[in-house]
Structures are given as structure tokens and as C-alpha cells.
């Protein structure tokens, strides 16, 4: 609870019987909670009303509401429920809400660069430096910071009086931020400044055009409007420090160099290091040992101004003066060099003369080109067999200047198509908050979670620098990339899952590509994704090439079936352990991929295998009913493995995941409807809580991705008397992966929320999604970074 001032729920807890002589001994684990804990929670909840603009979600609650830790009656506020469905207004943040914002504004698979709430670029993870994250940023969000000097400022002159204002919170008293990925709009106002400034920031994002969506570039498009009654002279400056080899520190013997370049429709300053590598398009086959001996941060970067005018000025160096004033004062110069131990900052200035009420726009670019991505530098043993290296964008462009030149030549189209996607997405009757939340996590592709090697191979961490290998049992929860950039998913199926990763003759798919063995949920997910990619591909040639290995992978799972349409034996899964017995959610995924395999077999004229898969799936649809225990699906635990983790008769979040997947690809039902809906209702009753604090007060193990006072759906609870967290932990595993049961994780919640909506439980599905959304309010943490085991976690 400590430090969590901005509660999403902001409910009041009533203690009308805390000291009554009529109180009986507590009937549940919650009896361990003392009055002080409730008072703390109540106090912080009240603070939520003061410090946070979020509506009250639920309550008031009594102590008795929490007798089962997760209250059965969620007591959702009618106003809050109404807000779930209302179209509402565009989400705009101001004041202190701006401080934690970091929206990805680089190309997909091109590094990670954030746009801050006041328009400053930060984070700058473009230099190929190994950086691990572990989930801790949920509780301790990153503080905006930059390893280099970069920014924008405006100089306004009226009747000879001049003022210089940085385009940050330091320069303007009223700044508003509206982030609708991939576009962000920032407004700058100040009563002492006779102009307003509007910033539109983005990187080209064009679904179905992966290359143009993967440009290593950020667009910053400033529109200045004269709000006074007099003519104003305006100068707009942008500057960029030469940070090439910033981390490898070549010493004073090396010189950084800035060069002004003029091209068709562009004025730019390119930064490099003297005697660096020749500018050339990188060929994958030429990623030699000599190339990999280059410093990882060797390359080029540039700041550019599109459609330059004769009055525009570029200075390769602003000298030693203070920024931003030095950017305006610097004399034009086409070349500058500086020893590596000293800063070298270049600036470009646009001049405008604006009559009263008039406006003008200047479009700046920041581009980069650091080709020497080398995954071996991570020193992870399981990546020893990973041979792919280099940046894909370097196979298209020889330098940052070339990237800027390409964007200058095609800017009208890139801008229009990015806006078209944005406008199409938001041209909806769906709530703004819902459109924001279900699109913004696609920014994971523009984070350091996602990479595209020089060979064209897509490769991802689970979260930034955490758990390698485009893990099958994590990435199969995500669908955005497949729908927006299906060529990347097709390549991932062909090159990795059914290529590098599949073992012959078993058909097992190593769940981390080059490493680790079979994960049954990931295996099923690969087969289902193959069917999805087939649906997203014209003709049947793609499937025809992969079908033998897809069939082999399906047969691998069939061998784990003892004839009843259910999986048995050792079943490693995304909860990082091998489970034994008949597991509802794993067998449900098995049934879904059987249906998908049958459809693919039919398309491949493999009628015998199609019939076999359908017969097994029909059998399994009946067999899985035996795991339905009155309210929800449980597992039949194999008693021969008492040491194994198993949720047993617990209410586990993914129990009907197979049916959720079936909806995604239009398959017939794999789990009966009545039981499926009852299971989802049980998840709402037993796992969704308006305040996770009460549960975590009892079950302390595990990471915190929902704090006291925050709503969420718990991974697994134990409503039955015959099974508990201790049973589920197995013998000797109390401090191990069983702690995952106590956690709240976004990617799992999205899966359930989507499934609820499929099944007609729209209010509950929206409530679960809104809980994720509200946990990521910028008064608390960065809305654009959904954290699990690492930043920008791919499951989301």
C-alpha cells in the first residue's frame, strides 16, 4: 500500500463491527488482516479521489465483503459501469500526468525511443546496448532521462522584444498530451507567449507495409499559430548531439563529426565518427566477424528539416553555449568535429513570419542507423546457436541521412497512410478509452522487445531483455502483429517454429527457437497460428510448403493423447513448470489446434488426417466435460507426481483458453458453450477483485503487477476446500513458480476479457480491460509500457 496514492478504485471500507463483542472468529484466511491494514487501504483509497481524475470504480465495501478475500459482489459503481460503454472524449493528459509518459515513436523493430508527455524524446535505446528488464518498473516506473542533448525550442519576437522557450514543461505553463498510437499530439500554451504550438509526433505506421513501418525515424511536426493581434517573428530550432560511439567511448584519439547535407526536399545534419565504416547497404551474408568487431554503437544519426526554405539555417556545431539559446545563436557551418570526450551538438533553425491569426508548419525528423546488433553480446548460453545478427533496416539504407532522404521523398504518402490508419481505427462508436488501450500495446513492436535481423528474421524477447527466443508459449497470446503485419508472423512460422525450432522426427517445437524443448501450450499455439497465417495469406502455397512440419507437430501432441481426446503426461507450459494429469486449459488448446489442423488438412487434400483430427476433437469435446466441476473447469492431478505444481481444483485464468483461440480463427466450438460461460462467470466471481491488496496480504509470494487499491483478475484462486495454494505448490516448491498463481498479469487478462466479450459477457469483459487501463494511468506509471516479466511484455 505504501506510496500508492493514486488508487484506481477509491472505494470506502466500512468498519462498523471491528470491535463489537458480537464478532466471531474469522471464517477465512482474511482473519489475519488487521484493522490497520484496512485503515491504510481506506485512507489511500480516499486519496485516490483527491489526486486522480479516474472515476470511482466500486464500493462501499464492508469487512464481510472480503471474507472470501475476493468479494463475490464487486459492487461496481453504476456511473463507472456506464463509463465502460460511453463513447466519451479523447483522452488528454496534463500537469503531473505528463511526467511518466513514454510513448514509443520509432519504427517497429528499429530500437526504442520514447516521446515524453511534454514532447521531449527520451530513453534512446537505439544503440544496441544490452539492457535487461525484470518487471520491477511496474512498481518503480522509469524516470525520463536521456544520454544525449536533444530538443526543440521556439524564439518569438514581437516589436523587438524576444523570448526563447524550450518546448518542454520548463518553457510552457500549459501543456496537454493526447497519445493515440501511433500518433501523439501535444499542445503548448502560455499566457505570456503570443503563439501556440502544436506537435504531431509519430513514426510511419502503415499496416501491411512492414518496411515503411520499420523506419529508424521519428517525425516531429510543429505547427505555430499566432494568437495575438500583431505580427510576430518566430524561429523554431531543433538540435541533436552526436552520440555515435557514446557507450563504447573511443577516447580523444577518435573524432566525432557533424556534416550538413542538402538534398531534394531536405536539409539535415548527419553525425558520425571520423574513419568509421563506409556507408553501404548491409548485406546479411556480409555480417562477418569483422563487422561484429565494430562497436555496437557505431553508426550514424541525423536531424533533418523537410521542405527547407532559403531562410533556414544549419549549424554543424552550436559551440559551448547554453541550450536552447546556443541553437539560435550558432553561426551556419557545414562541418564540425570534436574529440570524442567533448560534446558536439548540431542545430537546424526554421524562420517564420506570422501575421495575426496565421500559422505555419515545420516538419523535423530524427533518424538513426546503428547496424551492429549482436545478440551474442548478451552472454546468454541458450543463445549460443543464434546466428542471426544485424539490423534489417541497414539492408535498406546505408546511413541515417539516407533514411531521412527516403522519408523526404515519400513523406506525403507515409504521413497520409499513417493518419489514415489512425483515423480509421478511431472512426468508431467504441469508447475512446477502449480504442486507446487495445491499440497502444501494439507499440511493443516499436520497443526493444522486438527485433528484425539483417536476414529478415523476426525475433523477440518476452519483454525487453527478458527471456529470449520469441517464446511460443508467450507470443501466441498476441494477435496484433498477425493482423497488422502478417508477413512477420508468416516468416516466424516458416523460418523459426516450423523451421529452426522443430525437431525431427518427434515434431516437438523448441519453445525458444534455438533452445529449450516442447511446451505443449506453445506447440498448440504454433499450430493455431499457422492456421491463422494461412487465413491471412492469398492462395495455398505458403501452407503447402509448411504442411509436412505442421502435421508432424500435430502428431507430436496426438502421441500425448491416450485415446480420450485429452493430453496426459509431462506438460510444460507458460507457467514455467511441467504439470501432470489432465489439465483443462492445456487440453482445451489441444482441441482447438486439432480443429485447426483438420481445416488445414482439408485444404491440403489430406482427408485421412483431417478426419483423424476431427474424430479426436469430437471425442475430446465430450471428455473435457469430466473436468467441469459444477462451476468451472478443474484439473485431474496425477498422484504419481506429488512434487509437481498443479492448480488442481483451483479456478485458473486460462481454463477455457482453447475456446478463446477457436473464436480468433473461426473454428467450431471446442468446449461446450454452457460450461464455457459458467467457467467465465466463475472467473469473474472468484478471480476478479476490485482491490488486489486483500488477496496479496494473505498470499505474499509473487511479483506485483497490481498493487493494493488496484483492480485485476488473479491468475488462480482456490475456492474449494479440497485444494489450496499449498497443494498447488507441490512439495518443496513454495518459493518457486507456484507464486505465479497469486499474480495479476495483463496478457492473461486480455485473453479472458476478449473471450468474455465473444461469449456475450460484454460488461465483464470491458471491466477487466478497464482495470488494466486504469492501472496504467499516467499519474501512476507509463500507460504505454505494459509490464510483466519485463517491459513492453509481448503477451499483451
Regions found by a protein language model. Name each.
Residues 114, 119-123, 128-192, 278-330:
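An extended acidic
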Residues 59-86, 92-97, 185, 190-198, ...:
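Acidic/polar, glycine-enriched structural segments that form the non-catalytic walls/loops
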Residues 103, 113-117, 123-127, 137, ...:
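Short, solvent-exposed loop/turn and secondary-structure capping segments
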Residues 463-506, 523, 544, 548, ...:
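Active-site core of glycosidic bond-cleaving carbohydrate-active enzymes
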Residues 84-117:
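Mature N-terminal segment immediately following signal peptide/propeptide cleavage
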Residues 407, 411, 418, 613-624, ...:
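Short amphipathic alpha-helical coiled-coil/interface segments
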Residues 24-46:
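N-terminal secretory signal peptides and thylakoid transit peptides that target proteins
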Amino acid at each position: 500500500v505504501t506510496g500508492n496514492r493514486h488508487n484506481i478504485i477509491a472505494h470506502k471500507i466500512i468498519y462498523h463491527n471491528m470491535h463489537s463483542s458480537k464478532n466471531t472468529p474469522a471464517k477465512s484466511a482474511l482473519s489475519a488482516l488487521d484493522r490497520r491494514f484496512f485503515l491504510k487501504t481506506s485512507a489511500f483509497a480516499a486519496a485516490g479521489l483527491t489526486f486522480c481524475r479516474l472515476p470511482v470504480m466500486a464500493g462501499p465495501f464492508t469487512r464481510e465483503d472480503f471474507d472470501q478475500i475476493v468479494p463475490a459482489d464487486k459492487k461496481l459503481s453504476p456511473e463507472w459501469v456506464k463509463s465502460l460503454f460511453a463513447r466519451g472524449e479523447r483522452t488528454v493528459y496534463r500537469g503531473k500526468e505528463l511526467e511518466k509518459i513514454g510513448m514509443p515513436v520509432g519504427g517497429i523493430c528499429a530500437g526504442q525511443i520514447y516521446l515524453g508527455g511534454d514532447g521531449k524524446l527520451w530513453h534512446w535505446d537505439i544503440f544496441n546496448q544490452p539492457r535487461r528488464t525484470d518487471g520491477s518498473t511496474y512498481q518503480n516506473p522509469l524516470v525520463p532521462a536521456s544520454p544525449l542533448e536533444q530538443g526543440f525550442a521556439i524564439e518569438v519576437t514581437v516589436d523587438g522584444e524576444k523570448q526563447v522557450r524550450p518546448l518542454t514543461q520548463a518553457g510552457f505553463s500549459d501543456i496537454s498530451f493526447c497519445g493515440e498510437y501511433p500518433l501523439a499530439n501535444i499542445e503548448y500554451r502560455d499566457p505570456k507567449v503570443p503563439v501556440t504550438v502544436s506537435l504531431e509526433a509519430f513514426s510511419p505506421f502503415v499496416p501491411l507495409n512492414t518496411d515503411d513501418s520499420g523506419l529508424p525515424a521519428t517525425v516531429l511536426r510543429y505547427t505555430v499559430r499566432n494568437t495575438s493581434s500583431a505580427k510576430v517573428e518566430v524561429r523554431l530550432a531543433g538540435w541533436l548531439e552526436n552520440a555515435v560511439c557514446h557507450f563504447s567511448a573511443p577516447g580523444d584519439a577518435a573524432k566525432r563529426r557533424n556534416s550538413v547535407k542538402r538534398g531534394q526536399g531536405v536539409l539535415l545534419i548527419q553525425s558520425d565518427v571520423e574513419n568509421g565504416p563506409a556507408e553501404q547497404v548491409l548485406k546479411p551474408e556480409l555480417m562477418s566477424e569483422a563487422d561484429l568487431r565494430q562497436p555496437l554503437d557505431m553508426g550514424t544519426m541525423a536531424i533533418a528539416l523537410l521542405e527547407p526554405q532559403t531562410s533556414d539555417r544549419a549549424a554543424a556545431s552550436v559551440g559551448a553555449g547554453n541550450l536552447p539559446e546556443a541553437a539560435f545563436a550558432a553561426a551556419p557551418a557545414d562541418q564540425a568535429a570534436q574529440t570524442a570526450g567533448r560534446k558536439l551538438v548540431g542545430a537546424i533553425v526554421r524562420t517564420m513570419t506570422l501575421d495575426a491569426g496565421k500559422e505555419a508548419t515545420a516538419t523535423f525528423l530524427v533518424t538513426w542507423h546503428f547496424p551492429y546488433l549482436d545478440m551474442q553480446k548478451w552472454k546468454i548460453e541458450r543463445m549460443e546457436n543464434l546466428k542471426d545478427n544485424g539490423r534489417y533496416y541497414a539492408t535498406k539504407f546505408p546511413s541515417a541521412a539516407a533514411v531521412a532522404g527516403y522519408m523526404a521523398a515519400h513523406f506525403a504518402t507515409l504521413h497520409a497512410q499513417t493518419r489514415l490508419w489512425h483515423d480509421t481505427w478511431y472512426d468508431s462508436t467504441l469508447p475512446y478509452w477502449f480504442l486507446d488501450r487495445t491499440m497502444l500495446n501494439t507499440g511493443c513492436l516499436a520497443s526493444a522487445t522486438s527485433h528484425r535481423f539483417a536476414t529478415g528474421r523476426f525475433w523477440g524477447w518476452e519483454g525487453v531483455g527478458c527471456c529470449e527466443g520469441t517464446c511460443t508459449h508467450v507470443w501466441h497470446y498476441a494477435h496484433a502483429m498477425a493482423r497488422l503485419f502478417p508477413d512477420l508472423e508468416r516468416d516466424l512460422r516458416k523460418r523459426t517454429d516450423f523451421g529452426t525450432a522443430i525437431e525431427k522426427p518427434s515434431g516437438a517445437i523448441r519453445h525458444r527457437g534455438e533452445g529449450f524443448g516442447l511446451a505443449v501450450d506453445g506447440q498448440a499455439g504454433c499450430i493455431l497460428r499457422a492456421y491463422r497465417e494461412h487465413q491471412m495469406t492469398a492462395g495455398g502455397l505458403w501452407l503447402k510448403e509448411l504442411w509436412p512440419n505442421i502435421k508432424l507437430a500435430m502428431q507430436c501432441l496426438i502421441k500425448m493423447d491416450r485415446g480420450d481426446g485429452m493430453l496426459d503426461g509431462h506438460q510444460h507450459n507458460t507457467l514455467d513448470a511441467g504439470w501432470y494429469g489432465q489439465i483443462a486449459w492445456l487440453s482445451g488448446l489441444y482441441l482447438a489446434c486439432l480443429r485447426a489442423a483438420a481445416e488445414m488438412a482439408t485444404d491440403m487434400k489430406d482427408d485421412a488426417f483431417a478426419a483423424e483430427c476431427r474424430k479426436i476433437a469430437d471425442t475430446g469435446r465430450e471428455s473435457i466435460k469430466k473436468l467441469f466441476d459444477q462451476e468451472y473447469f478443474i484439473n485431474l492431478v496425477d498422484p504419481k507426481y506429488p512434487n509437481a505444481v498443479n492448480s488442481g481444483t483451483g479456478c485458473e485464468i486460462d481454463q477455457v483458453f482453447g475456446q478463446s483461440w477457436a473464436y480468433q480463427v473461426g473454428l467450431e466450438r471446442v468446449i461446450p458453450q454452457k460450461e464455457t460461460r459458467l467457467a467465465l462467470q466463475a472467473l469473474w466471481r472468484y478471480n476478479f477483485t476490485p482491490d488486489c491488496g486483500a488477496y496479496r496480504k494473505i498470499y505474499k509470494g509473487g511479483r506485483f503487477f497490481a498493487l493494493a487499491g488496484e483492480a485485476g483478475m488473479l491468475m488462480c484462486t482456490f475456492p474449494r476446500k479440497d485444494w489450496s495454494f499449498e497443494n498447488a505448490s507441490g512439495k518443496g516448491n513454495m518459493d518457486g513458480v507456484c507464486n505465479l498463481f497469486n499474480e495479476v498479469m495483463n496478457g492473461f487478462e486480455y485473453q479472458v476479457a476478449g473471450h468474455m466479450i465473444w461469449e456475450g459477457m460484454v460488461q465483464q469483459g470491458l471491466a477487466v480491460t478497464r482495470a488494466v487501463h486504469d492501472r496504467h494511468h499516467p499519474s501512476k506509471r507509463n500507460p504505454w509500457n505494459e509490464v510483466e516479466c519485463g517491459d513492453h511484455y509481448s503477451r499483451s
